[in-house]
Amino acid sequence: MARNAEKAMTALARFRQAQLEEGKVKERRPFLASECTELPKAEKWRRQIIGEISKKVAQIQNAGLGEFRIRDLNDEINKLLREKGHWEVRIKELGGPDYGKVGPKMLDHEGKEVPGNRGYKYFGAAKDLPGVRELFEKEPLPPPRKTRAELMKAIDFEYYGYLDEDDGVIVPLEQEYEKKLRAELVEKWKAEREARLARGEKEEEEEEEEEINIYAVTEEESDEEGNQEKAGEDGQQKFIAHVPVPSQQEIEEALVRRKKMELLQKYASETLQAQSEEAKRLLGY
């Protein structure tokens, strides 16, 4: 059973429609909405535009029309939507209802608008056209940033350069560069040496031999240093002499003697201390 749209396109239907319209003056829709001065006619033209939009939206659902036909239909629908908006503004100016607020928005909801495209919408199969599908795909979320603790977990010896020589590449390069630098330094030293000889200056080796060793210490100097007098901060004379370093045994004996003296001073009487000092003097300690 044929559809109504197919019946309307038959030759008999077109002929019958032509007979009905014969003798009538077909009124055309004004090009500009501002040219209409009657509210009923403005309502009529708005309804006519809505009917055309509905037909074209139904046609564009067929993906087999071809890319170029689908693009043309989508452009025509967007053009009619803009024209419908102009007529709604004109109806409001003529005292009619504000369709921008109270009118149905089903036609607008059928289209999908690309962000930043100034109201241009895609209907039906136009959404799946090449280059259009990518516009509606959401951008993938960026990978989450790693925290400082996660970054520190990946740090190893290689990060600090301890394993750079294991690849066997950098060592030969460094050796080659080192030889090159040494050769340049030798050439520079030879050039400076020849320049000094040309000016009649002595070589550095001869100058080093003639220099006096300031660190050499003779017996006379050591005796003089032992008896040298220097003034201190308080103005008193201080004698600097080289004394032998005591051994570990001598240090222990000195500590024992000091401990004995502290015990005698703490527990012995003055008479006993005097007797002890007298005995030490007689024995020659």
Curated annotation (Swiss-Prot):
Biased composition (Basic and acidic residues): 227-236
Keywords per UniProt: Acetylation, mRNA processing, mRNA splicing, Nucleus, Phosphoprotein, Spliceosome
Pfam families: Isy1
Modified residues (Phosphoserine): S247
Species per Swiss-Prot/TrEMBL record: Mus musculus (Mouse)
The name this protein goes by in its record: Pre-mRNA-splicing factor ISY1 homolog
Protein's job: Component of the spliceosome C complex required for the selective processing of microRNAs (miRNAs) during embryonic stem cell differentiation. Required for the biogenesis of all miRNAs from the pri-miR-17-92 primary transcript except miR-92a. Only required for the biogenesis of miR-290 and miR-96 from the pri-miR-290-295 and pri-miR-96-183 primary transcripts, respectively. Required during the transition of embryonic stem cells (ESCs) from the naive to primed state.
One of the record's GO cellular component terms: nucleus
Family according to the record: Belongs to the ISY1 family.
Subcellular locations according to the entry: Nucleus
Compositional bias (Acidic residues): 203-226
Listed GO biological process terms: generation of catalytic spliceosome for second transesterification step; mRNA splicing, via spliceosome
